[in-house]
Structure formats: C-alpha cells, structure tokens
Amino acid sequence: DCESGPCCDNCKFLKEGTICKMARGDNMHHYCNGKTCDCPRNPYKGEHD
C-alpha cells in the first residue's frame, strides 16, 4: 500500500486514529487516517470548540 512515511509500517498504512505527531503548543495531536502514508494536519485547539 505504501513505501514510507509516518503513517506507514512494513508497506501497510497504519490504522486510522494512530498518533503520527504529538500535540505541541496550540496544535492538537495529528492522527493517521488509514488511507495515506503522510501525517494529515489537524486544526488548532479551540477551532472546533
């Protein structure tokens, strides 16, 4: 499925909801979506409160 990236392990996508980047500052955790090998960006804290 994939070759490399933060959401890829042994040529397979990591399952949806796997943290690929820890929260820092005003950013929330970033999670794998189970469909890409890249780590999708998540919104800032408070943006959806």
UniProtKB/Swiss-Prot annotation:
The keyword Protein transport does not apply. Residues 1-47 form the Disintegrin domain. Expressed by the venom gland. A motif (Cell attachment site) lies at residues 24-26. Its main location: secreted. The keyword Transmembrane does not apply. Inhibits ADP-induced human platelet aggregation. This is Disintegrin ocellatin. It comes from Echis ocellatus.
